[in-house]
Amino acid sequence: MSGLGEIKNDHFSDRRWLLRYGALALPFILLRPARAVERVGSVEDLTGEAFAENGAGRRNLDRAAPVFLGDEVETGVASRLGIRLGRNTTVKLGDQARLKIDQYLVDAGGEMTLSSGPLLLDGQPHRAGVKILSPFAMIAVRGTRFFAGPSNGRFGVFVVRGAVTVAAASQQVTLREGEGTDIVSPGAPPTPVKRWAPERIRAALASVS
């Protein structure tokens, strides 16, 4: 009986300790700040209006505003937005564009989703590279300057410098400087690689500048 009594006493003693000190510790647990959202860049240039949205809500962007991992960045009508990610990568968005920063390790690459609008990405070579996902294609980048977005009524990809791989509908093409491809609709394969005409290049770059 003494052994059973000792076990019971220990049990009730443990419960009293947990109730007393657990209650004291609870406010400190509740008040402990949530893990900070990771900042991956900032706004360099803005014409018109732009917004960013994540789990914390929606906010207006202006020059020098921070950009965080998980942000979905959106531009307004006739607006232009320039973002610097880390030290070596810049992203320019044109009219009514939407870009989500899904993953990004500063100056080491990442993954972004372009839902709409035109984009111009300029980056130095990354060991891991950058992937741009869209409803039309997946674009794999390793240090390049390229355009992606609406062009001549289609989704076009054009390389200004470097090289990218464009994959869609289980097919892929590799573009090098001066070359482009089109995806006519979501689910369609990329068209054969060809050099874009100067007027088309100018129109594409003007849509993000």
Language-model features: locations:
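N-terminal secretory signal peptides
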Residues: 1-13, 24-28
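Flexible, surface-exposed loop/linker segments and immediately adjacent secondary-structure boundaries
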Residues: 23, 28, 36-72, 76-77, ...
